[in-house]
Regions:
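Short terminal alpha-helical segments
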Residues: 1-31
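Acidic, low-complexity, intrinsically disordered interaction modules
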Residues: 30, 38-88
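Short acidic DE-rich linear segments
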Residues: 92-96
Length: 96
């Protein structure tokens, strides 16, 4: 099911996201903090792009009910995805 696959993808990405947050929290020097922050920023971009790509590739299966999975996406990732997500939703509406 699309919902289960989407939740699985989000869960796996959220695990990495948490590890990156932890590395920022655990940074001992300014340089470690800076590098950890850069890694997190890059990952947020990758995470949002992978969600977009997944959704776009499964567009014909996407329903409003499946979209409840997006409640699990961190806000910072959602903020990057939301503009592209509206394109997907508009396309889904046209298909149905």
């Amino acid at each position: 099911m699309l919902y289960d696959e989407l939740v699985s993808l989000i869960d796996s990405k959220n695990t990495i996201y948490k590890e990156l947050n932890d590395s920022i929290y655990s940074a001992k020097t300014d340089e470690e903090y800076k590098q950890a922050s850069i890694r997190k920023k890059h990952f947020v971009h990758v995470y949002s792009q992978e969600l977009y790509d997944f959704l776009w590739s499964r567009l014909s299966e996407l329903t409003a009910k499946n979209c409840i999975a997006f409640d699990l996406v961190p806000y910072i990732v959602w903020a990057q995805l939301s503009e592209r997500y509206s394109i997907i939703i508009d396309t889904v509406k046209k298909l149905k």
